[in-house]
A protein has these predicted regions:
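N-terminal [4Fe-4S]-dependent radical SAM core
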Residues: 1-81
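Auxiliary Fe-S-binding modules of radical SAM enzymes
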Residues: 2-12, 17-21, 209, 217-300
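Hydrophobic faces of well-ordered beta-strands that scaffold small-molecule active sites
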Residues: 21-25, 80-85, 113-115, 139-143, ...
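Short catalytic/ligand-binding loop motif for oxyanion handling, primarily in non-cytosolic enzymes
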Residues: 32-33, 54-55, 91-92, 265-269
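A contiguous, low-structure linker/loop signature
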Residues: 66-107, 112
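A structural motif corresponding to the C-terminal end of an alpha-helix
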Residues: 107-110, 168-179, 205, 243-255
Length: 300
């Protein structure tokens, strides 16, 4: 049991009675700020990847089985969460989504679906589909808010207003669907107050879970070009921990903390270089959590 915050592991143990693992799945989809509907460049921090929709990118059963083989190297778990992670996983024809999500959720080894998407890619028919699936097994929807600062949002090319996020949260929660919000700490130009305001904004909107992600500056991104110009600097580990811990203490106790850092492809990571060793970073964070006596909800 984590003494400092309501961790995802604690939530999974409480909900399913055992440790379950996420299976990261890629449907080969894209985003509206990549395919030209809103923009063609994508978010400023994002590496190029899938760029077109194809319903023939592999059978979902094969994808799940391959992901299970990877996880099997680390655990003997038998139950999993199907995590549709890459790009915008509701940005496709509803009939295709229904087929893929239904096939996944009906598997005996899948206990829940987690669907990462954009709040502007949740038309009523997709929300209705997710609600239908949620009556079978739990469905989580992960929304990439990143920041509640509209000026920063424009800079990172998020391409939607905060009101779109709050509306999506309201519509999903009205159907009993859990919402997870992704927030990036350390975005260019943001102050400590800006980052804390983003966490407060998500909590007030009613998010059930939160992912707190360190900004990674990756070679090959537009963000990297700005970094080379010296227009901003990456957070040090001490700066990151100071902000992270205050975020945790401002979160209500019932919000599940799904992530307190993140992974970046080492071959592309330009900064901060200290984040490359995730195990060491997590050990450092956990040690400091204890030393400082951090407690979620203390300042909520």
């Amino acid at each position: 049991m984590n003494k400092h915050y309501y961790s995802l592991n604690d939530y999974l143990q409480n909900t399913f009675g055992e440790k379950v693992y996420k299976l990261s799945l890629d449907l080969g989809l894209t985003c509206p700020n990549r395919d030209g509907r809103l923009d063609t460049r994508g978010c400023i921090f994002c590496l190029a990847g899938s760029s077109h929709f194809s319903a023939c990118e592999g059978d979902i059963f094969e994808k799940i089985d391959r992901a299970k083989q990877l996880v099997a190297k680390k655990t003997k778990a038998e139950r999993f969460i199907a995590y549709f992670q890459s790009f915008t996983n509701t940005y496709a024809p509803t009939e295709y989504l229904k087929k893929v999500f239904t096939e996944a959720i009906l598997r005996e080894d899948i206990v829940a679906l987690s669907v990462a998407t954009r709040p502007d890619c949740l038309p009523d028919e997709v929300v209705a589909l997710l609600a239908e699936l949620n009556r079978i097994k739990p469905v989580w929807v992960e929304l990439g808010l990143q920041t509640a600062n509209e000026k920063t949002a424009e800079y990172i090319r998020r391409c939607y207003k905060n009101s779109v996020y709050t509306d999506a949260v309201m519509r999903l929660k009205s159907e009993g669907i859990q919402v997870i919000t992704h927030i990036i700490l350390g975005l260019p130009g943001e102050t400590r107050s800006d980052m804390l305001a983003s966490v407060d904004f998500a909590a007030k909107a009613g998010t059930d879970g939160i992912k707190l992600q360190l900004l990674h500056i990756l070679r090959g991104t537009d963000l990297y070009e700005d970094y080379l110009k010296g227009s901003f600097s990456a957070l040090t580990i001490n700066e990151y921990m100071d902000i992270l811990f205050e975020c945790i203490e401002r979160l209500p106790e019932n919000i599940v903390v799904h992530r307190i850092t993140g992974d970046a492809p080492k071959a592309h990571l330009a900064a901060p270089t200290w984040s490359a060793d995730k195990k060491t970073v997590l050990n450092t964070i956990n040690r400091e959590l204890a030393l400082r006596g951090i407690k979620q909800g203390r300042k909520a």
